[in-house]
């Protein structure tokens, strides 16, 4: 077998073609280098040449070509028929012997396995049924009894019976326990299945539930609050440390002053004992000594105040020793003239107290005046106000009035500006009227006041279009993109200050309502985010209702001529600019009408959003005049309940989005502020109490129609949910 395998592998590795005839190899022959040739071809070649035709190796009788036996199947026909029969016979005999040997081995294995199987079955029966064992033992005992009846005693039989009873009882108990455990196992399996199903159901609900919309914002708000509280605690700790150091310095200074006063008193007592007993001379000398003491104390106090650090380095034990020795000397030497020294002692105490007060003031001025470098590193960390939009008022009003906090207002403005910029990263928080946000741009306002005056003059020129602007208390809370936004906000603040002087009662009532609203605003940012989502849904419903109402109204048929409307509005704007006195009268009328509606606002109605457009002076070429209507009537200016928010009135988000698109088309730059949809909804919730608007007396129907058309065109940008759907 191994020989045939070797031949087969060799024949498979050899090439099939001959190198001489280039045909199929017949009776293959190989040279030393294993080149294959036909035997006939190599014989013909060796008649003329004694070298291999492929590798030129000499072929001699010592190194002849070797024949391959069994290389191909052409050698098989060479065998005769009888030889082939014998070969087949031998092959069959070999196979038969092999199969018989295998059958014998398998039969032996089967017998062994049967015997093992029987033994295992008997073991299983004995384990599962112990009674059979007992019965088998009893049968054996019976056989033994029958064989040897005289050998077994009745006592042994009684003992075995007792053992059998105990065994049966134990078996029954174990069986009952097994049944109980099976029932408990079934119950646990059922409970496990129910819990698994409930777990799967909860997982499916969690997978199907939409992700929380404001989860990230709530986490960011909480993180900012934690950082803010940590900064506040660090600031308070540092302030306490500084106050402790300051108190220690003051105590050391007081101890020094006491030591100096006691030393001076001891010296005075010594001088008094040394003086003669004359009354007049003693009084004169006492007065001289007192005057000298005053001069010495007045001279020594500044030096002690300037060198307080060197006195602080001295140990307290030496001071105590000095004071104790001075006291002993003063008591021993002042016993003689006790009655005479009382008045002088009182005068000296008064003089020393006055001197200490002056020296304390000078010490404070020099001590805190010489520390500008100590105050600088705390400017960015502690010297800004920390009340956030959502912090409680009790924590936001905390401030330690240490001497380092009494800095220039420029430093405080810088610190508060940095802090407000840090807090304005979160868009969805409520607007607040805290001092740090309102004083944020104080330095920028001082720097760019000249630009404000120039731009206000440009705005008041008769060439510009009519400006409808309303004063809001939240004007400084909004982020403008460029310096033009800041200057325009300042001009609007000046107009609001003028209007607030004319409407005192209305402003006071609205300020009271805002103050009460700010005091009650202690909610967390997560609740504010949920309110924002709720307001988005309400704005969607209102916009759908307004679309349905506007589709039914007959005013939708005449909205095709925008240029004519723009021309009429520009002519009206020029008339308004020619008559500034009339504008002031109209503003007074609007303020009086707004004050009449305070009762409605106090009864629970929310403030309406009246946005203002801040246009550049180069808006002469624009055809349309952006004027706001608080109602559909062109004469009256009434504040309506929240149900009419999107029907006959501009919301702030609509006006901002439409105006921003128009400004980008006209290439006037980014002069309006950018606000996200959450800030629009929150600002609609926190309405401004300073809502006043210039409304002209003469308005055409085309103006109202254009406003309604603007509402319909920009309702899709009112809420963030509709924007995401589109």
From Swiss-Prot:
Any GO BP: regulation of DNA replication
One GO molecular-function entry: zinc ion binding
Modification comment: Auto-ubiquitinated.
CC annotations in GO: chromatin
UniProt zinc finger (RING-type) residues: 18-56
Biased composition (Low complexity): 300-320
EC category: transferase
Regions annotated as coiled coil: 87-129, 155-270
Name this protein carries in UniProt: ORC ubiquitin ligase 1
Major place of residence: nucleus
InterPro entries referenced in this protein's UniProt entry, alphabetically: OBI1, OBI1_RING-HC, Znf_RING, Znf_RING/FYVE/PHD
Localisation: Chromosome
Organism of provenance: Pongo abelii (Sumatran orangutan)
Region described as Disordered: 274-335, 687-726
Subunit composition and interactions: Associates with ORC complex. Binds to chromatin; association is cell cycle-regulated, absent from mitotic chromosomes, is associated with chromatin from G1 and partially released from chromatin from mid S-phase.
Record field: compositional bias (Polar residues): 321-334, 702-726
EC number(s) on file: 2.3.2.27
CDD domains, per database record: RING-HC_RNF219 (cd16562)
